[in-house]
Amino acid sequence: AVLNALANGHERFSLFELGAGDGVKTKHLLRRALEQGRDPLYRPIDISGHVLDQLGRTLKKELPALRYQAEQGEYFEAIERGFTDPSEPKAVLFLGSNIGNLDREQAIALLKGVADHLGPNDRFLVGFDRKKDPATIRRAYNDSEGLTRDFNLNLLHRINRELGADLNVERFIHTPVYDPALGRALSYIVSTCDQVVHIPGAEKPVHFKAWEAMHTEISQKYDD
């Protein structure tokens, strides 16, 4: 049903995916489309060229008949650049509740930006994470396995690895909070002590006060 809605009766169409990542969800749709005799042009959009290269290699191996054209960049610039081709109908995917990583104003701007480039035969499918029991959401962002914690603290490891900084990751903690009134889950990295961080090439060192927080992640939940 999802594929039929996206294809909208067309055998050839361009399938854009915002924030494609590894494309694991979309591969099922693409495989099914090819099995039905359709000829989609998959156009994943991601800020990471490495991710897109890896995705392209995987799809060439798993779905060799698939047409593939990646778009690297921020959502807005990729939309402006990639949505201008009128030769095929467009279907746009924004899955995995990724829209929740934008604040309200950004989400509205993105939806409007996509809509402005869609015609009457085009389709747009967005995945939203709905509001639910606050305890359930708090557990998700403070999971016992520490997956969300490690995901956020990995930002510090990357700063050390890619910029040569001397952050002591052990001196930071991950602190998630959830506001049920706004439906907004936020993640922070908090310094547990006064500390100074040096980054090669930076004009001056970065000073952290004890319990100073850095906002690292937003996950907006939606209702009707």
Which residues fall in each region the model found?
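Short amphipathic alpha-helix with an adjacent loop that forms part of the alpha/beta core around
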Residues: 79-87
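Class I SAM-dependent methyltransferase SAM/SAH-binding core
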Residues: 30-78
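Residues at the N-terminus of the alpha-helix immediately C-terminal to the conserved SAM/SAH-binding loop
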Residues: 25-29
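Conserved alpha-helix/loop element of class I SAM-dependent methyltransferases that forms part
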Residues: 1-13
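A short, conserved alpha-helix within the catalytic core of class I
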Residues: 101-113
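Substrate-binding/catalytic lobe of Class I Rossmann-like enzymes that use SAM or dcSAM, i.e.
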Residues: 130, 136-224
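Class I SAM-dependent methyltransferase "Motif I" SAM/SAH-binding loop
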Residues: 19-24
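Conserved beta-strand signature within the Rossmann-like core of class I S-adenosyl-L-methionine
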Residues: 116-131
